[in-house]
Amino acid sequence: QEAIEVGIEPDIAEEIITVLIRSSLTKQEKDRVEAEGKGNGRSVLVIGGAGRMGRWFVDFFNSQGFETFVADKNIQNDTHSYSDWREAGIDFDVIIVATPIEVSAGILSELSEKKPSGLIFDIGSLKTPLRDGLNALKDSDCMITSLHPMFGPETELLSGRHLIFVDVGNKEATDKAKELFESTMVKKLDMNIDDHDRLIAYVLGLSHALNIVFFTALSGSGEAAPKLAKLSSTTFDAQLLVSEAVASDSPELYFEIQKLNEYGIEPLDALCTSATMLREIVMNDDQKSFIELMEKGKKYLDSRS
């Protein structure tokens, strides 16, 4: 009401207030992370630290007062940088593996032979492809755990974000990893390897696949494709926004998420089955089944609120 009285659209006023609140919370969180820094001069090696999520962790640990080292094939050797992680050695308080999933699997296995004494964790989107390397580190009595940040490298405020901790048999390591994020407002979730990948098959695998199918159908629509680019509707624009984000991300990472998950085919089958069911309902002019489908979906989505 106050916005209307001063000539500002309520939606715009709400958006401005939301931005201001998030900006304030972001500053508070950053100040707290710096003030309660867990680093105290301790050292951390981020393998894959020149990548997008790798850089996020480099910045995060720098802000906590860690002496941060980066190993990445795309950088040159320097006092705190290595093009080959093996050249960095293993004498670090924390070692983070932030490389593509298949690369991470090999690095974890190699680390198990070197037996670092510090905390070790990966940040992979999938865990089943890393099972052997994680178990090898556990069997070598290393301080190993596994994390999955459910947020992207552009994230500044961790409030409302989720960080999954996958204990692989060393609770002390998992607890130490959690301590690193105590000064943030991130929501910590605990899962085992198999439950994690079953859920991720739907949370990431299905949502990615749905958007890939969506923009593939649009781009393959023939003569309609250029005309579609000029049309707009609330639902279409919302879906398009998500699909554009998916299409702009790493196709290599998205393929890994689809291909390497032991549980990845199930949601793809469910997507195909659902699309076929919808097609048959429409082809058969079955309004009753269509309404039931919509109501069933609404009931499920309402239950998530």
Residue ranges and their predicted role:
Residues K227-D302:
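Interdomain hinge/lid region at the active-site interface
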Residues W56, N62-S81:
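NAD(P)-binding Rossmann-fold cofactor-contacting core
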Residues L126-M191, D197-I200:
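Rossmann-fold dinucleotide-binding core
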Residues R52-M53:
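Hydrophobic/small residue at the entry helix of a nucleotide-binding pocket
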Residues R161, T174-D175, L180, H196-G222, ...:
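Active-site-proximal catalytic alpha-helix in oxidoreductases
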Residues W85-L137:
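Rossmann-fold NAD(P) dinucleotide-binding segment
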Residues V44-G48:
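Conserved N-terminal Rossmann-fold NAD(P)-binding element of oxidoreductases
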Residues Q1-S43, Q64-E67, D72:
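N-terminal hydrophobic or amphipathic helices and topogenic motifs
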